[in-house]
Amino acid sequence: MGIKHLFQVIQENAPDAIKAGDIKNHFGRKVAIDASMSIYSFLIAVRSEGQQLMSESGETTSHLMGMFYRTLRMVDNGIKPLYVFDGAPPKLKSGELAKRTARKAEATEAHEEAKETGTAEDVEKFSRRTVRVTREHNAECKKLLKLMGIPYIDAPTEAEAQCAVLARAGKVYAAASEDMDTLCFEAPILLRHLTFSEQRKEPIQEIHLNRALEGLGMDRKQFIDLCILLGCDYLEPIPKVGPNTALKLIREHGSLEKVVEAIENDPKKKYVIPEYWPYQDARELFLHPDVREADHPECDFKWEAPDVEALVEFLVKDKGFNEDRVRNGATRLQKNLKTAQQSRLEGFFKPVARTDEEKASLKRKHDEKLQEQKKRKKEEAKAKKEAKAKPRGAA
């Protein structure tokens, strides 16, 4: 789910934090991708009749189709993807997950009813709501990535939090996810729409955390408090508190502690805090998530050549994919992963801190240059003055 209305809040209050651009702009960059969110998006990319893509044996293959072709698109554009899979969810998230399960059960029932009596739009709408990523989906996607030579790692808990760690450490350029809560985990840069299909023609959104904080006039802790008020995966939102109200409350009171106090002491009782609302626990999960440090052995990764024949065996013979397309994809992987090794120019020219002696020398040269310019201007002004004073016709 992520954070409700957060993109809208940033767009309206810190527009400089958001850049929209083409996928080609990220040539030569390594990106950590929230795998579970990507797989979910592949699964809901259903046909208009509400059916998943399936093999001859009736197995769902939408996740594999999406993972194969969207990864190819990234590699074709010089991006080196690293997929990060979710681990066990934090205990505080269990309430939200239980609600999602209940909603999916209701949607399944509604989907069956819509197939009998509803319109095509109803069928597709409820079909999307029944989708969930299973262990089997994850396992098959991991197998596919290994055969493609694309690295993946397992996060202890939240994939977005692990992506953020890798981005902060400089092991990747950015974290990629549709979930805006990636920013709460302190990802310096969040990329959205990176795994969307080309047909959707959606630009890649690049969101910079430091610019968002600056535009909102908040520190990180206040930003997290704002996100909790907006509505996150860990807590139900406060009824009647929308994005504008949430922003106003944090700006006015500075912290959730003071917001809660103000709401509880309000004689009008305009807002009501849910009976069980452990916002401090939620904040702690954002501030100190269960992650592996970037230098942990399990966070080592590298891109390798695809295993072409094993890829054909898995996708063509087991899953019914077209052999020519799979072989063509493998050829593109081999070629473009080598091309992506050519780092961007910005990677070659990293700024190096200057010594005090070098700084003094540069300042001296700068001052000398200024003095020289002043002297030249003075001489030019004097020459012009003399030229004007000289009588016409004088030799």
Curated annotation (Swiss-Prot):
One Gene Ontology term of the biological-process aspect is: DNA replication, removal of RNA primer
I-domain: annotated span: 122-253
Is ATP-binding a UniProt keyword of this protein?
A: no
Main localization is nucleus
InterPro entries found in the cross-reference section: 5-3_exonuclease_C_sf, Flap_endonuc, HhH2, PIN-like_dom_sf, XPG-I_dom, XPG/Rad2, XPG_CS, XPG_DNA_repair_N
Q: Which cofactor does it need?
A: Mg(2+)
Could you tell me what the cofactor note in this record states? Binds 2 magnesium ions per subunit. They probably participate in the reaction catalyzed by the enzyme. May bind an additional third magnesium ion after substrate binding.
Q: Does the keyword Acyltransferase apply?
A: no
How would you classify this enzyme at the top EC level?
hydrolase
Q: What modifications does the entry list under PTM / processing?
A: Phosphorylated. Phosphorylation upon DNA damage induces relocalization to the nuclear plasma.
Region span, Disordered: 102-121, 348-395
Residues that bind DNA: R47, R70, E158, G231, D233
Residues bound to Mg(2+) 1? D34, D86, E158, E160
Q: Where in the cell is it found?
A: Nucleus, Nucleolus; Nucleus, Nucleoplasm; Mitochondrion
- Origin: domain of life: Eukaryota
In which residues is Mg(2+) 2 bound?
D179, D181, D233
Provide the alphabetized UniProt keywords: DNA damage, DNA repair, DNA replication, Endonuclease, Exonuclease, Hydrolase, Magnesium, Metal-binding, Mitochondrion, Nuclease, Nucleus, Phosphoprotein
Similarity field: Belongs to the XPG/RAD2 endonuclease family. FEN1 subfamily.
- Record note on quaternary structure: Interacts with PCNA. Three molecules of fen1 bind to one PCNA trimer with each molecule binding to one PCNA monomer. PCNA stimulates the nuclease activity without altering cleavage specificity.
Give the function comment from the record: Structure-specific nuclease with 5'-flap endonuclease and 5'-3' exonuclease activities involved in DNA replication and repair. During DNA replication, cleaves the 5'-overhanging flap structure that is generated by displacement synthesis when DNA polymerase encounters the 5'-end of a downstream Okazaki fragment. It enters the flap from the 5'-end and then tracks to cleave the flap base, leaving a nick for ligation. Also involved in the long patch base excision repair (LP-BER) pathway, by cleaving within the apurinic/apyrimidinic (AP) site-terminated flap.
Q: Which HAMAP family match?
A: Fen (MF_00614)
Descriptive protein name = Flap endonuclease 1
**Which organism was this protein described from?**
Aspergillus fumigatus (strain ATCC MYA-4609 / CBS 101355 / FGSC A1100 / Af293)
Which gene carries the instructions for this protein? fen1
